[in-house]
């Protein structure tokens, strides 16, 4: 590592090792590092042809018509017939196209006259359309939706011209032991979020990467997502080989997720400026080139219709300025009274307890009641 990073950029950040937030007080215990296979691995045979990648962009014209631009990358035999269709929520085909496969990338566009629009569940119906590509034995589908999201400099949101006040939470880890994604567990969390009237969730830059199934579930439910890139609370190497890795990561995330109507914005990461101000106030913001040059270039090139936000929090005279941009409510973790309500609170902390079974095994009966309130937090300080 170059000498200029010494004492500033942690080795784990310079090596670009993915780890979740188990390393400090923000992360849930126990402190474990995953290893081995924790998600499905598949082997596909391209016979005679297979779809290596499908990316979709959707937008609304000034007249209110919908456009779906599709990019297909094939492997296998060229000149194989394929068909693309777009079905509405009732299964009716509203647009289609066909062609023959070719090596490299192919682009095509579908138009829909006055499509039903996608809304967050608190303000309307989250109408989704299904895009399907078929060729021989191959069939791949993607959920898409049509909506216009406008976000002002003061983080005021309008969806399809309608002002929408955002209420939400940050997503933590589903399983601290296996790191495996469990659809039924995530469905329960999303149920609870909606019971709490949340219409936005933040995919935290230090949390786990989530699969396609999660984004489709948010599409169907009408839950908006603030999507961080996976940087968090650290300074980062700006060497060219590292910048190339960050560029590849961003391109992969956008190509595989940008078609989801639930994603409201891309954010450069979690607390990069805040980490510098708290930990190394006199040092350069190493990693700023990633969030100010690399990520915005990728977003402008691959997803120009969606807002890019540099880092959370940022926007004021200092990173966590509650009067401008977004802010993280660290003082709320200790329930400080009289705190002025911030402008846009994108992260907040609350203390939770373990399950009753765990507490009953590890604590005395006296500790489980009101006079032992402090013991609860001392045994398990974590955030939800």
PLM regions with names:
Residues 33-36, 266, 297-299, 334-384:
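Substrate-binding clefts and catalytic carboxylate motifs of secreted carbohydrate-active enzymes
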Residues 6-13, 22, 31, 151-158, ...:
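Active-site mouth of glycoside hydrolases
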Residues 77, 273, 351-353:
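Short, acidic Gly/Pro/Ser/Thr-rich loop/turn segments
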């Amino acid at each position: 590592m170059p000498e200029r990073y010494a004492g500033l950029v942690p080795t784990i950040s310079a090596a670009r090792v993915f780890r979740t937030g188990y390393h400090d007080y923000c992360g849930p215990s126990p402190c474990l590092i995953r290893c081995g296979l924790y998600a499905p691995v598949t082997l596909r045979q391209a016979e005679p042809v297979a779809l290596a990648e499908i990316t979709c962009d959707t937008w609304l014209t000034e007249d209110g018509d919908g456009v779906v631009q599709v990019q297909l990358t094939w492997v296998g035999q060229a000149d194989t017939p394929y068909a693309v269709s777009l079905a509405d929520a009732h299964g009716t085909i509203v647009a289609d196209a066909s062609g023959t496969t070719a090596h490299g990338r192919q682009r095509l566009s579908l138009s829909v006259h006055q499509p039903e629009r996608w809304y967050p569940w608190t303000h309307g119906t989250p109408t989704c359309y299904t895009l399907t590509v078929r060729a021989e034995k191959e069939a791949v589908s993607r959920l898409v939706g049509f909506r216009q999201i406008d976000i002002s400099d003061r983080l005021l949101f309008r969806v399809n011209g309608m002002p929408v006040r955002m209420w939400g939470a940050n997503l933590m880890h589903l399983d601290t032991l296996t790191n495996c994604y469990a659809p039924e567990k995530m469905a329960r969390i999303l149920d609870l979020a909606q019971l709490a009237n949340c219409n936005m969730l933040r995919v935290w830059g230090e949390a786990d990467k989530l699969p396609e199934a999660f984004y489709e579930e948010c599409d169907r439910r009408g839950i908006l997502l603030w999507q961080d890139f996976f940087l968090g609370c650290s300074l980062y190497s700006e060497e060219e080989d590292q910048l190339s890795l960050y560029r590849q990561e961003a391109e992969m995330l956008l190509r595989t997720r940008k078609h989801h109507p639930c994603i409201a914005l891309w954010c450069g990461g979690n607390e990069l400026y805040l980490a510098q101000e708290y930990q190394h106030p006199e040092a350069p913001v190493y990693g700023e080139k990633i969030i100010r040059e690399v990520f915005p270039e990728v977003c402008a090139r691959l997803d120009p219709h969606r807002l890019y936000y540099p880092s959370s929090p940022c926007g004021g005279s200092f990173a966590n300025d509650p009067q401008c941009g977004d802010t993280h409510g660290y003082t709320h973790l200790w329930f400080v009274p009289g705190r002025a309500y911030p402008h846009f609170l994108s992260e907040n902390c609350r203390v939770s307890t373990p399950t009753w079974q765990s507490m009953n095994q590890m604590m005395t009966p006296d500790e489980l009641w009101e006079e032992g309130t402090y013991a609860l937090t001392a045994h398990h300080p974590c955030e939800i």
